[in-house]
């Protein structure tokens, strides 16, 4: 019995030992340094950015009351959300004629480009920062000895900084257009039944855009985080060391010349 149980116990312990070895190899103190701590913030705020934008949904509406007593008051409720292709969202406009009951209408505008770019950038930032944290914590010696890793990290960090600025600004402008297109007054202005004398239209509840506004704020926070991290990543590159060597070179030579003059 003991001979049969020993292989099974060894098989059970081997995955645990591998996990323990992996956790022991992680240098958690790297998270206390700016290079690792900012990466954690970038990872978190990337989740907040694409999560708040990608999960947004709202509704707008209006009330149409026909002067014809045969028809009741019609309530129009239009649901919209990410990716904000408003021109594909349908709603039924009531008609006050006796012949037909309603007409299919669409919201105006397509704002999917800035929204999808914003969410895609957040997802890429999430995966890159997660991979960078693994390198910092597990393979930091390889990161410091191989000069290509800091150079690649610096170039990618600068690129993400630029893209976050563009994405946050573009999505901020797109969100402003979304607010204008989904405003209840815009909804009533687009319905022809509201321009005649056969009906009276009133605006419904204004859409709550709080989560979408926060997503724009998270976008600019990501920009500042990536911009601030550029300096700390640059310090790990060979370019920073060359700048220090060039700055110290003339001072050391002048000190040597002064020592030679004093000896003479």
Curated annotation (Swiss-Prot):
Q: Where do the record's region annotations for Disordered lie?
A: 242-264
- Entry membrane topology: Multi-pass membrane protein
Provide GO CC annotations from the record: synaptic vesicle membrane
Tissue localization of expression is:
Skeletal muscle.
Q: What PROSITE patterns does the entry give?
A: MARVEL (PS51225)
- Where does it live in the cell? Membrane
Glycosylation: residue positions = 213
The record's listing under InterPro entries reads: Marvel (IPR008253), Synaptophysin/porin (IPR001285)
Vesicular topological segments? 55-116, 172-213
**Which family does the record assign?**
Belongs to the synaptophysin/synaptobrevin family.
Q: What is this protein called?
A: Synaptophysin-like protein 2
């Amino acid at each position: 019995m003991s001979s049969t149980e020993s292989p099974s116990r060894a098989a059970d312990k081997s995955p645990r030992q591998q996990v323990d070895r992996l956790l022991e190899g992680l240098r958690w103190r790297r998270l206390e340094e700016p290079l690792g701590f900012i990466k954690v913030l970038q990872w978190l705020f990337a989740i907040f950015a694409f999560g708040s934008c990608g999960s947004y949904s709202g509704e707008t509406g209006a009330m149409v009351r026909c002067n014809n007593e045969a028809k009741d008051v019609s309530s129009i409720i239009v649901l919209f959300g990410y990716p904000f292709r408003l021109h594909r969202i349908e709603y039924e406009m009531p008609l006050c004629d006796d012949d037909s009951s309603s007409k299919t209408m669409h919201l105006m505008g397509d704002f999917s480009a800035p929204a999808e770019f914003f969410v895609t950038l957040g997802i890429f930032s999430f995966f890159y920062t997660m991979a960078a944290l693994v390198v910092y914590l597990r393979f930091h010696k390889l990161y410091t000895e191989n000069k290509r890793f800091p150079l690649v990290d610096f170039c990618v960090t600068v690129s993400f900084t630029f893209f976050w600025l563009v994405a946050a600004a573009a999505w901020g402008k797109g969100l402003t257009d979304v607010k204008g297109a989904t405003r209840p007054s815009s909804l009533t202005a687009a319905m022809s039944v509201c321009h005649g004398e056969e009906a009276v239209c009133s605006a419904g509840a204004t859409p709550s855009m709080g989560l979408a506004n926060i997503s724009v704020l998270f976008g600019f926070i990501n920009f500042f985080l990536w911009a601030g991290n550029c300096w700390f990543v640059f310090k790990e590159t060979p370019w920073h060391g060359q700048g220090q060597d060039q700055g110290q070179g003339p001072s050391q030579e002048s000190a040597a010349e002064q020592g030679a003059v004093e000896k003479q």
